[in-house]
């Protein structure tokens, strides 16, 4: 698996240390094993996980600004855990309402010795934002409107929303509330992944 991961990273132009590659491969191995009992992801093949979960997460890293992030609806830790591995100086709160997912996240934290993640079982509307976050990340929300509505209390004054989407969501962008605007849309290149991927970066317009 390490060889395939190295080839994918090279194709994507991403440079990581051997330790980071080992951690990413170990995470995929854990996800594959736990998935059989916990049904954490519909992706069953570890090689496919490398593309659809690992690469698809870490291509976002260059666009993140700040040190404190929250991954809302993280599920089995996506994109939060891969991002935490490639950005060791940043901290990621991994938020999910389902206990079995959070148990898996805590086991990953323990086995991989990841000190820059905090798994939390909570609904997003009940989770306090003290202190506020530099970035709110998610690939779980059905729409951008849902994301800013449910998570509006989480980012700080200069914080951003980072939404991972497939095709460019023009209708969703057009229907954003007036107090939010799109700062940029980045087309993401994920080797061996079919279909388009975009990162939509949203800021609050409040003064």
From Swiss-Prot:
The EC category is: transferase
Which Pfam families does the record associate with it?
A: GidB (PF02527)
Query: Cross-referenced Gene3D superfamilies, in alphabetical order?
Result: Vaccinia Virus protein VP39
Q: Which UniProt keywords apply?
A: Cytoplasm, Methyltransferase, rRNA processing, S-adenosyl-L-methionine, Transferase
- Which InterPro entries does the UniProt record give? rRNA_ssu_MeTfrase_G, SAM-dependent_MTases_sf
Instruction: Quote the catalytic activity from the record.
Output: guanosine(527) in 16S rRNA + S-adenosyl-L-methionine = N(7)-methylguanosine(527) in 16S rRNA + S-adenosyl-L-homocysteine
Cellular component terms (Gene Ontology)? cytosol
Report whether Membrane shows up as a keyword of the record: no
According to the lineage, what is the superkingdom? Bacteria
Q: Which residues bind S-adenosyl-L-methionine?
A: 73, 78, 124-125, 139
Subcellular compartments: Cytoplasm
Q: Which SUPFAM superfamilies match?
A: S-adenosyl-L-methionine-dependent methyltransferases (SSF53335)
| Nucleus found in the keyword field | no
A single Gene Ontology MF term assigned here is:
rRNA (guanine-N7-)-methyltransferase activity
Which EC numbers characterise this protein's activity in its record? 2.1.1.170
Its family remark reads: Belongs to the methyltransferase superfamily. RNA methyltransferase RsmG family.
What does this protein do, in the record's words?
Specifically methylates the N7 position of guanine in position 527 of 16S rRNA.
Q: This protein is called what?
A: Ribosomal RNA small subunit methyltransferase G
Species per Swiss-Prot/TrEMBL record: Salmonella agona (strain SL483)
């Amino acid at each position: 698996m390490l060889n395939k991961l190295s080839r994918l990273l090279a194709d994507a132009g991403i440079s990581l240390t051997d330790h980071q590659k080992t951690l990413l491969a170990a995470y995929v191995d854990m996800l594959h094993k736990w998935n059989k009992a916990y049904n954490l992801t519909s992706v069953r093949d570890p090689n496919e996980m490398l593309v659809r979960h690992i690469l698809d997460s870490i291509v976002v890293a260059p666009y993140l600004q700040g040190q404190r992030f929250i991954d809302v609806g993280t599920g089995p830790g996506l994109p939060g855990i891969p991002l935490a591995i490639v950005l060791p100086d940043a901290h990621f709160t991994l938020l999910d309402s389902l206990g079995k997912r959070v148990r898996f996240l805590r086991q990953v934290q323990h086995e991989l010795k990841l000190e820059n993640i905090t798994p939390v079982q909570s609904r997003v509307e009940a989770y306090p934002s003290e202190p506020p976050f530099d970035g709110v990340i998610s690939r779980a929300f059905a729409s951008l409107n849902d994301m800013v509505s449910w998570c509006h209390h989480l980012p700080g004054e200069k914080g951003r929303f980072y939404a991972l989407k497939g095709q460019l969501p023009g209708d969703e962008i057009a229907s954003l509330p007036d107090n939010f605007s799109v700062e940029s849309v980045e087309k993401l290149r994920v080797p061996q992944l079919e279909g388009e991927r975009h990162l939509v970066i949203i800021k609050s317009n409040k003064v």
